[in-house]
Every structure is written in structure tokens, then in C-alpha cells.
Regions:
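Residue-level signal for the short linker/turn that defines the boundary of a DNA-recognition helix
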Residues: 8, 18-19, 45-48
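DNA major-groove recognition helix of helix-turn-helix/homeodomain DNA-binding modules
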Residues: 48-63
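A short, Lys/Arg-rich alpha-helix, primarily the initiator
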Residues: 1-16
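Short alpha-helical DNA-recognition segment
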Residues: 18-37
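Short, charged recognition helix plus adjacent turn
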Residues: 1-4, 55, 65-70
């Protein structure tokens, strides 16, 4: 499920927040290519980063991974 919903949701949340991939990479101390990989479904962030993403964007981890639509 993470591979199908997460990339699109992450990209939309990042754009809605007015952030570039480079901004997200800096925030999470990862490479820009890691963020790009998350957004195309090539790879997945660790659970700790998922939790931090949910806090940053004000959504639940369940929303990020597609278990909930809100």
C-alpha cells in the first residue's frame, strides 16, 4: 500500500506546503535523490521519517500510507 498511495500523497503535501524536494531533503537530512525516490515509489522512508512527516504536514501516518483518506 505504501508504494501506491504514499508517493502521490507526499508529493501533494510537499507542494501544498510550498516546499521543494531540496527543502524536504534538508529538513530530514537526506539526499534530494532520496526524496525523489520516495515521490516516484522507487524507495521508502524509514518509519521515524514517516512519523516526522506526519508531524510536519499535520496528517496521520495512516493518511500518508493510504490506510485513511483524511
Amino acid at each position: 500500500m505504501l508504494k501506491t498511495c504514499f508517493p502521490e500523497r507526499l508529493k501533494q503535501l510537499r507542494r501544498d506546503a510550498g516546499m521543494l524536494q531540496a527543502d524536504l531533503a534538508e529538513h530530514f537530512k537526506v539526499s534530494k535523490s532520496a526524496v525523489s525516490g520516495w515521490e516516484v515509489g522507487r524507495n521508502q522512508p524509514c518509519y521515524d521519517i514517516l512519523i516526522d512527516m506526519s508531524i510536519l504536514f499535520g496528517v496521520s501516518v495512516d493518511y500518508l500510507i493510504g490506510r485513511r483518506n483524511y
